[in-house]
Amino acid sequence: FDENVSELDRQALIKEAFDFKVDKNGANSIPRTFMVKDHYSDVPWSKRISGKSFWDKKWIDIEFDPVMEIDLNPEWKTLDEYSSALRKKSRAKLRRIDKDSSALVLRELSYEEVVENADKLIALYSMVYGRAGFKLGMLYKEDLVFLKKYWKDDFPVIGYYFDNELVGFQCGIVTDYSVEAFFVGFNLNENKTHSIYQRMLIEFIKQGIARGVMKISLGRTALDIKSSLGAGPKRLVCHMKVNNRPIIHSLMRAVASSSSPKIPKLKRAWDDELTSPLSISSRS
């Protein structure tokens, strides 16, 4: 949503979008389960009633791990300027990652190249996806191809090559406001040698600086690594509603009561006076 759209108007628009029927086996039926994914939560832990939605009493709030985000200072025009605001250990880490990944060749793939390499890209993605502790949906090659076709240059797919072999890729949505990391994939053995994943995080930061965005969203996993590079945690909730299924609704509320992960103590990447506002607000 545009930042000028109020919270009440956002809720009304979302609820209106759910007022539809689908055709199932030739008969119209109304979906019984709805989900609104990734809504920022500023409700303090002490005031949060697990499971009960702060958005609407008929909904359930389920909270997972926080998303790691970076607020960019508009004065930062290069990665060096970004790095200069970090603490000494984080600057050293950036240099180490750059050295470890120096043998890699990075190249943005065209739509035609995404289509041509779709099977390989998904195979690399599956190596990472298979190790994930929490899984909500999976990327298929048709999705990847469609996203590139629809978003064009705003969906850069970066290939990582070692000895002319594709060993990794990253992709995300890049707008004038934010960079949102979507999916990554890489050869696990090459990652150990060349720090592919950590290099990808740096490339997302570079994309944000080059585009002049306000925010970079790096996703939920690997909180410690991302915090050491300057990201801070932001709490997100998923709103769920189950119609005409009181037993399932009760079970979902029970699940929600145990889905309130505390944000762990993370590494401090910024000097005290330059600490990201995201890191401060996430402590509420």
Question: Where are the regions a protein language model picked out?
Answer:
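A conserved beta-strand-loop-helix scaffold within acyl/acetyltransferase catalytic domains
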Residues: 18, 22-194, 274-284
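Hydrophobic alpha-helix feature that most strongly marks membrane-spanning transmembrane helices
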Residues: 126-133, 149-152, 165, 171-172, ...
